[in-house]
Amino acid sequence: HVGFVLVNLKSEIEKYKRIRLEFSTEASYYSRLREELHHFLADVENQDRILGIGISVPGIIKPGDGILIKSHALQLENYSLGFLEQTFSLPVYFVNDANAAMMAEDLDRYKNALYLSLNNTLGGAFCIDGKLIQGENQKAGEFGHMILVPEGKQCYCGKLGCADAYCAASALTDEKCQTLEQFMKSLENKETKA
């Protein structure tokens, strides 16, 4: 899925749209993305006042370079995202998806906060004193690879016992429930199968 969000300088959402578009590294994917963005902005007045585009990506991004160092979800490694600026003719800023979600929170109100991202993989982000903490290698919120169960289940990264092997949506919905919503409902109902 791809989500388009138009946000004003007060961090208020002006417009939102989500479309189903399977990721691809093919040029046709980026052409379609550009078309969808133009369609999304078609009825927006003062488009010349748009300052830039933020793109959140599931993976580790090298700050300032637009290099996706690694993304398990997209199955990419050392992939340059820089060409997207030419695709959109606006400044483009890249950020990890969980970090983007953390920054979307009211960091003036929640000075110290933790965000957990539960998707195909387990991710997260946190802030201290209203500042996003990313760490030297941009992995500070990668909670999915903290060892939860020593010598436990094998994770896709090759290590044993990573939190991701137990807490990612795919792990929570394997044989027990068909969907994440069903799993959450089982938790609410305090069912032992959850």
Q: What positions do the PLM features span?
A:
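ATP-binding/phosphotransfer module of carbohydrate and carboxylate kinases, centering on a glycine-rich
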Residues: 1-49, 88, 108-109, 150-154, ...
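Short, acidic Gly/Pro/Ser/Thr-rich loop/turn segments
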Residues: 2, 60-62, 122-123
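Cofactor-binding loop segments of dinucleotide-utilizing enzymes, especially the Rossmann-like FAD-
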Residues: 9, 97, 118
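Glycine-rich phosphate-binding loop and adjoining helix at the ATP-binding site
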Residues: 14-42, 47-112
